[in-house]
Amino acid sequence: MLDIKFLRTNFEEVKAKLQHRGEDLTDFGRFEELDTRRRELLVQTEELKSKRNEVSQQISVLKREKKDAEALILEMREVGEKVKDLDNELRTVEEDLERLMLSIPNIPHESAPVGETEDDNVVARTWGEVKEFAFEPKPHWDLATDLGILDFERAGKVTGSRFVFYKGAGARLERALISFMLDLHTDEHGYEEVLPPYMVNRASMTGTGQLPKFEEDAFRIESEDYFLIPTAEVPVTNMHRDEILNKEQLPIRYAAFSSCFRSEAGSAGRDTRGLIRQHQFNKVELVKFVKPEDSYEELEKLTNDAERVLQLLELPYRVMSMCTGDLGFTAAKKYDIEVWIPSYGTYREISSCSNFEAFQARRANIRFRREPNGKPEHVHTLNGSGLAIGRTVAAILENYQQEDGTIIIPEVLRPYMGGKTVIK
């Protein structure tokens, strides 16, 4: 959520920056109307309440003096009715303004490339050499099915499309990657491990920006009004909702493994085979709470931490600086890390690393004090995948495949695989 005072005094500047996102700003224009009316109603209500108090005191005096107060009593009733009407209108205007504020995306950072679509994203850097195969490489779903380590067909029978059973070496590879990533981020990168709940309430989804805009993308448990988490970002960020932190606590860095659940409502017909787009998938998420002046340095560190996973796995990748039209709703700046997938003949996203500045913290009321009695300020929040496990499995299967259909296990994972060197 944006700062309403900043928006009020910089309306045209904010509008111009949001236009770079390619957003429909039709409703945005109502901000000035609603904000002005809200302030008018507050003034009118306070004036009438003040008058009501004065009249009430006058009535008390008249009654003590045993004088006729009927006219003032009637006047007070009229004032009371007007106050009630104004309070009702104020409540409606504030609800409309709150809904509008929750629907306004974050302001792009000045360093985000200006553009409309993914074609305008900028390559920040690449790492590793794309392997040239002496044979026609197979897609990971065929490799895994032939090896008996992934079973999409039976998962479809048990649940439906976009689900999978991991079996044998496939299940162990998934588990190995989870342990490897958590060990790396906690032991070498300084994150604290968190295992979060997989269900959250509506306030948590609103705090990180999934609601109200993206409710159709979420799995909701209607009886409780809980949501299955689309990412560990949601519960981990909301750990500190409605809290005031001390300066000495910052930065806070969490690494959280979780399963994630997404309806993929807008992805019908895309990536229908394999692990790239599943309704349920595992992920290690990196979440940071930092002082505002440190957030862009921390974004670079977070992105480097996610990249380190791919470097140790020796998987070629590139880092994209996302343009203003491809930032997503909540980010002020975002890097996508894309790993090379041979069967696609291109790079595919495996991590998004974002700086939300105070956007989430304002929605979730997460603040800190620089001094013991100082005025609370909003922290800046960041997060990134470190990494998406299923897509990492897909990248390993395809990049490490051999002509006979076996898979060489990356060296860094072998201690987690019981010393095995090959999946066959």
Curated annotation (Swiss-Prot):
Record remark: domains: Consists of two distinct domains, a catalytic core and a N-terminal extension that is involved in tRNA binding.
EC class name: ligase
Residues annotated for ATP binding in this entry: 262-264, 349-352
Oligomer and partners: Homodimer. The tRNA molecule binds across the dimer.
Organism of this sequence: Bacillus anthracis
Annotated L-serine binding sites: 231-233, 285, 385
Compartments in which it is found: Cytoplasm
Pfam families attached to this UniProt entry: Seryl_tRNA_N, tRNA-synt_2b
Name of the encoding gene: serS
GO annotation (BP), single: seryl-tRNA aminoacylation
Entries under PANTHER family matching the protein: SERINE--TRNA LIGASE, SERYL-TRNA SYNTHETASE
InterPro entries linked: aa-tRNA-synt_IIb (IPR002314), aa-tRNA-synth_II (IPR006195), aa-tRNA-synth_II/BPL/LPL (IPR045864), Ser-tRNA-ligase_type_1 (IPR002317), Ser-tRNA-synth_1_N (IPR015866), SerRS_1_N_sf (IPR042103), SerRS_core (IPR033729), tRNA-bd_arm (IPR010978)
Protein purpose: Catalyzes the attachment of serine to tRNA(Ser). Is also able to aminoacylate tRNA(Sec) with serine, to form the misacylated tRNA L-seryl-tRNA(Sec), which will be further converted into selenocysteinyl-tRNA(Sec).
Protein name: Serine--tRNA ligase
